[in-house]
């Protein structure tokens, strides 16, 4: 009878260790990748674009985003460099997309359309190392 209890205890301990290991592996695999809004911008009407530039930071912050790059120097390695480059970081691709699709941002992106030529992308980033 004592041997049966030891075997049962061993099986239970092994099962708990297995569940704990599987949970740890799953939590590593379930890491949320950051999301980025990336824009190439050529401002055609600086005065109107300034109105957009003043309003957009509040919409970004509302979705947990922050600027990684906002203008500044650009050096071309291959191809033509954009006049202005912007990278905005979010906690996830979904948060970045939610910002882009939000009514807050939707209310002002027409200002950008009227004052600049741009290409804007939402991309999923790599996990932090």
Please place each PLM-identified region on the residue numbering.
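Short arginine-rich
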Residues: 105-122
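Short S/T/G/P-rich N-terminal loop/turn motif that feeds into the first structured element of a domain
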Residues: 5-10, 14-103, 124-129
């Amino acid at each position: 009878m004592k041997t049966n209890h030891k075997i049962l205890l061993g099986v239970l301990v092994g099962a708990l260790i297995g569940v704990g290991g599987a949970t740890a592996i799953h939590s590593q695999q379930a890491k949320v990748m950051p999301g980025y809004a990336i824009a190439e911008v050529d401002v055609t009407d600086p005065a109107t674009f300034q109105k957009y530039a003043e309003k957009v930071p509040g919409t970004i912050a509302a979705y947990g985003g922050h600027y990684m790059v906002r203008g500044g120097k650009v050096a071309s390695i291959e191809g033509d460099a954009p006049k202005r480059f912007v990278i905005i970081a979010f906690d996830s691709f979904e948060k970045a997309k939610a910002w882009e699709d939000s009514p807050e941002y939707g209310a002002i992106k027409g200002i950008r359309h009227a004052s600049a030529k741009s290409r804007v992308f939402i991309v999923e980033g790599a996990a932090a190392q």
